[in-house]
Amino acid sequence: MNDDSNGRRRRPAAFPVGTEDATSRELEQTPRRAPGSFSDKIVMTPDADDPFIETTAAIEALNPPEARPPRRRLSFGKIAAGAFGILISLAVGLWVDRLVRDLFSRADWLGYGAVAVVAIGAAAFLIVVAREIFGMMQLTAVQALKADLAAAAVAGKAQAARAATARLVHLLAGNPRTAKGRARLADTEGEIIDAPHLVDLTERELLAPLDREARRIILGAAKRVSIVTAVSPRALVDLGYVLYESARMIRAMAELYGGRPGTLGLLRLMRDVVAHLAVTGSIAVGDSLVQQILGHGLASKLSARLGEGVINGLMTARIGIAAMDLCRPMPFRALKRPSIGDFLADLAPGAGRTESATGKA
C-alpha cells in the first residue's frame, strides 16, 4: 500500500497502542548517569574502639549452643534400677496375692471383689505403660527423622530426601498450622528438585509457622517467670515456678513439633535440656553479664527483685531455645535459629535500645 502519489513505500515503524504511561515517559526522558568512580574509602573500626563490642559479645555469650540429644548407652545405674524395679514388682505381686487369699478366706464375695479391683488396676497400669512407651518411641522417631533429613541434604540423594520429607509431612499432618505448607509440598511431587533445595523448601513451608509459635511459647514463659520472680516473696517460690514453667514449656514445645511425650518422656527431655545447659556452662547468668546487657546505669536503678526477674526470664528463654533444638524434627538450615537477642527487647526494654544501636553501628 502506497503512502503518497509518487509510489514510494512507507518504511516500517512502531506505533504505541493506547495511552502511554506517564511514568514510563518520564523515565525515558530522564538522562542516565554516566559511569563514575568514587574515591571515598571504607573505614574499618577496630574492635578495641567499637563502643558496642562488649554488649554484642555479652548478648552472644547468652546464646546456648545448639542442643543435641545424647547417645543412649546401657550403664550400670540403669541395670541396677531395672533389677530393683523387678524386685519391687515381685514384692508387690506377692503382697497382692496374699491379700486376695486372705479375703477369700474371710468371704468369697470379698475375694472376687479384690480380684476385680486388681484386674482393673492392672489393665489401667498396662495402658499407662503403653502410652509412656509410645511417647518414648515418638521422641526417638523424631530424632531419627532429624538425622535422616540432615543426612539426605548432605548426601544429595533426592529419593532419600523425598522419603524423609514424606515422613515429616505424616508427622505434622495433625497440625493445622502446616496445612498450607503441606499443600505446597504436594504440588511439587512431580517436579525435579535437588535434595538440599527440597529439604530447605520443606523447612520453610512446614516449620516456619511452627517456629513462630515456638518463639511465642518461649517469650510467654519468660515473661511469666520474670513477673512472678519480681513479685514473689520467697526464693523457693521462684525456683518452684521456674521448674513448673520450664516443664510446661518443654511439653508444649514437644507437642508442637509432633513429639507428644508422656511423663517419662517429659522427664527425659528435661534431663537432656538441663544436662546440655550444664555441660555448656550456660545455665546461669552472671551479674557482670547482666550489667553489660542492661547497662550499668539502668542496672543500678533497677530493684533487686526486678533484676532477678530479668535474669530468670533470660534463663527460661535459654531453656526454651535448648528445648526447641531437641524437639524440632529438622536442623536449622534455611531458617535462622532463635537467639537471646530476639527475646531481650521484650524482657528488658532498656536492652532493646542498646541492641538496636549495636545493629546500626
Swiss-Prot record:
Residues 1-40 are annotated as: Disordered. GO terms for cellular component: plasma membrane. InterPro entries: DUF697, UPF0283. It is found in: Cell inner membrane. It is a multi-pass membrane protein. It comes from the Bacteria. Keywords: Cell inner membrane, Cell membrane, Membrane, Transmembrane, Transmembrane helix. The keyword Chaperone does not apply. The chain crosses the membrane at residues 76-96, 109-129. Residues 22-31 have a biased composition (Basic and acidic residues). Belongs to the UPF0283 family. This is UPF0283 membrane protein Smed_1530. The lineage of its organism: Bacteria, Pseudomonadati, Pseudomonadota, Alphaproteobacteria, Hyphomicrobiales.
